[in-house]
Amino acid sequence: MSAVAIKGWCPGALRPMQSGDGLVVRIRPRVGRLDAIQAVGIAELAARYGNGLIDLTSRGNLQIRGVSDAGYPALIDGLAELGLLDADSETEAQRNILVTPFWTAGDDTRPLAAELERALAGASLDLPTKFGFAIDDG
């Protein structure tokens, strides 16, 4: 039995983590939402460059596993075309926002999450690795 390696950080799209089956590429949907084009695009990218499966994390992110080093650049290009990448890995790591699944049209959840994302993108914060924000206006 092999020892478990604790990395001390979470993977992202721009900072993938090596695992036993290849790279783990984590996608953090903006404001906790995907449109239909993004959802289909992620499925196609997972089938082409990963193991074909998409994992849903406990914090509402998606991850594609089994990505090869050779396929990673094309996967990143595809995620960029879908509007799912941040400017850099530091911004990506800070944008860890969990949005209630019980939001309703017209409530403040989406505007609050969008404003928090904008504020985080321009900030240089020294947050703990697994620090996150949760938004529930109900």
Regions found by a protein language model. Give the residues of each.
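Intrinsically disordered, low-complexity polar/charged tails and linkers
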Residues: M1-Q18, Q38
